[in-house]
Amino acid sequence: IADLSQARTCNAYRIDGYAAGEGPLPPPGTVDEPQSQAVTSDKPQDIYGYPVVSSAVPIDDLSRANLSKVLSDPGTYLWDVAKGCEFLPGVALRFTGSNVNVDILICFSCDELEIYRNGERVGHEDFDPRRSDLLGVVKKLFPEDEAIQALN
């Protein structure tokens, strides 16, 4: 995660945390990333059980640099905090390298993220101290998304 510039592809997706494992999936072809290159669950149009509700949005170099800075900073995380909220991610970030794939699911309701490496969950942490930084990047990536733009 420390150097996202090494990733071959970097895409962001809107996902529906409230509909995990239920409801209809988006129509075929709405995710424009080949599934053979994606780390997904057994459903072709979801990421770890969360339905994908947008096309892939390429993450630009500036956003990638900002994400690298925020995600690699130990001060981003509240290491000794436990929250009682339900993790309902609305955004997934997917970084694909030659030997490693990293997915980061972000929940702005509880300011938590989950990290998956090559399909295995390797972390879950609170990011309250850097919420505004992550939200700024996500708002830039999804300028037409009313739900994302309404977050503050």
Model region roles, listed by residue range:
Residues 1-152:
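Function-determining sites in protein domains
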